[in-house]
A protein has these predicted regions:
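Hydrophobic/aromatic-rich structural module bridging two neighboring secondary-structure elements via a short loop
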Residues: 54-71
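Membrane-interface helix caps and helix-loop-helix hairpins in membrane proteins
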Residues: 57-61, 83-90, 110-120, 139-145, ...
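Terminal transmembrane helical module of multi-pass membrane proteins
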Residues: 118, 141-183
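Hydrophobic residues within membrane-embedded alpha-helical segments of Major Facilitator Superfamily
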Residues: 17, 36, 43-44, 50-51, ...
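Alpha-helical transmembrane segments in multipass membrane proteins, preferentially the mid-helix core
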Residues: 105-112, 129-142, 159-167
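Single conserved hydrophobic/aromatic residue that forms the stacking wall/gate
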Residues: 1-6, 10
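Helix-coil boundary and interhelical linker segments in multi-pass alpha-helical membrane proteins
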Residues: 14-34, 78-95, 134-150
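Small-residue-rich segments of transmembrane alpha-helices in multi-pass membrane proteins
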Residues: 11-17, 66-80, 122-136, 179-183
Length: 183
């Protein structure tokens, strides 16, 4: 709870910075895609904060659905500015579209996924997150080194963190997962 709420200020500041950057450069696509990314980030952490803060069991189950669904939105929202601003060709558009289709699939089937297994859900998140590997060479050529390094580092942190998320016998495994996410 504290990790989600505490980082909210930084996410809002980051969103404002990105939107102003797009406005300053007169780039409507950048403003739109940065807004999609920032909004998906804020919505996920708001959902996560509510899910972890509300003790009512019935409300908690509904909020868990929203929380888990918003993870798909954040992954797609993260891909959107990279793919559409830096790769506005068929490859970038295809990867971005595929990412949003996986998000829609994950949200629609979230009730079933939640009943089956957290591991199945995690595998779908990881597949969506590493979708970029299907077009790795063009992505490496299109992204500046810093952007690529940050994207890979973020992907590795999230991916490695899923080990702790699924390690339910480990005390505070969920808190450790959140630390990886904030990284």
């Amino acid at each position: 709870l504290a990790s989600s709420a505490a980082s909210d200020v930084y996410k809002r500041q980051g969103l404002i910075f990105l939107i102003l950057y797009g406005i300053r450069h007169g780039n409507a696509l950048a403003v739109t895609t940065f807004s999609i990314f920032g909004s998906s980030l804020i919505v996920l952490y708001l959902a996560s904060t509510l899910y972890h803060a509300i003790p009512n069991v019935r409300a908690k189950r509904a909020l868990q659905y929203v929380d888990h669904s918003c993870i798909f939105l954040l992954i797609a929202g993260t891909y959107t500015p990279f793919m559409l601003n830096l790769m506005p060709n068929w490859i970038g558009i295809t990867i971005c579209t595929a990412c949003w289709l996986i998000a829609a699939f994950g949200i629609i089937f979230q009730p079933w996924l939640m009943k089956k297994s957290d591991k199945l859900n995690t595998c779908l998140y990881l597949f969506q997150g590493w979708l970029v590997l299907f077009a790795f060479k063009p992505v490496v050529e299109a992204l500046p080194f810093t952007g690529l390094a940050l994207l890979v580092a973020g992907g590795l942190l999230y991916s490695f963190g899923t080990i702790f998320y699924n390690w339910q016998r480990l005390p505070y495994h969920h808190a450790v997962w959140h630390l990886f996410v904030l990284g």
